[in-house]
Amino acid sequence: KKLKVVKAGDFVRVRIPDKGGFFQVGDKVFKVGGKAAFTMSPEACRTTLDQVAVPEKSPAQKEILAQARSQGLASLLPASASPVASAQTLTVRGREPQDMHVLDEPGVAGFELVLTPETLAGLKKVDHHRADWQGRVIWEIPPMLFGAEWDEYRRAVGMLAGQGFKRFRLNNLGHLPMFAGLSEISLLGGFRCYTLNSQAALAWQELGLGELTADLEDDRKNLQELLRRADHLPPLAITIYSPLVVMLSRIPVRGVRPGSVLRAEGGEGYRVFQRHGLTEVLAEQDVSLLGHLAELKRMGCTRIIVDLSQCGALSARGKQVLAACAADQPLPETTPFNYQRGLA
C-alpha cells in the first residue's frame, strides 16, 4: 500500500498484527490513514498502546536467562571487600597555557590542556621547561577531528613529544594511531573513552591506556563497583567539577549569540558556543561533586579532575572552585547530575 509521510497533527492508526495479538519483529505497525483512531498526544497514545501485551516468558526461557546472567556475573573481576582510602591527586584542566601556573598552587599535581592551534601558539609565552613542571602537563586530543586535521594533530603530537611532553589524553579509538612510533609516551583515556564497567576498562588497558576517566554521567553505585576492582584495572580518575557537554556537533546553530542561554520548555538552560567549526551546547549548571570528596576517598578514588577550561584556572571563578575543592564544600548553582539520583 502507498504510505504518506506523517506530519505534526496528522492522525495515525495502529494495526494489531494477526499473530496472537502481539507485535513481532518485522511487523509494519504504524501507517497513515484517514480515520482518526487516535491523535499523537501522549495520553491517546498511552491508552491505545496499553492494549499491546508482552508475552510472558516460559519457565524454561527464564531459567536460561538466569543462568546466562549468573555466568556473566561470575566471570567478572573479583571485588575487594573494602578499598583502602588513599591521598587524592588533583589534575586541573585549564583554558590556556598561562593557566599552567596553577601547578604552583598547593595540592595541584597535574595540569591538562586541550591541544588546539591557539594553545599550541600560546605555549611560546610560557616557560614550560621549568624543572618542577616536567611530567605534570597533559595534552588532550579534541574528540572530533575531520579530514586533514588528523595529520595536523599527528604532527603536533610529535612536536610536543620532542619538546619533552610525554602525557596525552585520548577521547576515542581514532586517536591511538597518532602515537605510533613515539616512545616513552603515556596515554590516558578521557571520559569519552567510556568506562562504565570493568570489561570496558580491561579493553582500554589492552589498547595501551594507563589511566581512565569515569563518565560524567556515572552514578555513585557504579563508581563504587569500579573502584572495588581497582587492583585489577588501570587507575580511574573521577571528574569532580566540569561543564556538562550536552551536544557537540558540526551543525551550526543560527541566530544565537555565543554564550547566550537558551531556555527549554521544562526550564532547563543551555549555553551555546561555536569553537573551531563545532557547535558545543553546555548545560547552564556545571557538574560538581564538591562536598562528596570524603565519600569518594572512602570508596577508593585516588585521582580527581577539576575542569576549569570554560572559566580559566586563574580566574576568580577558577579560584573559587579550587578553594571549594580544598575544603570539600559544595558550590551553589551546580548539579551532582546522576551521582546521587542514579543512571536513568
Where are the model-predicted features located?
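Active-site pocket-lining/capping segments in soluble small-molecule metabolic enzymes
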Residues: 1-344
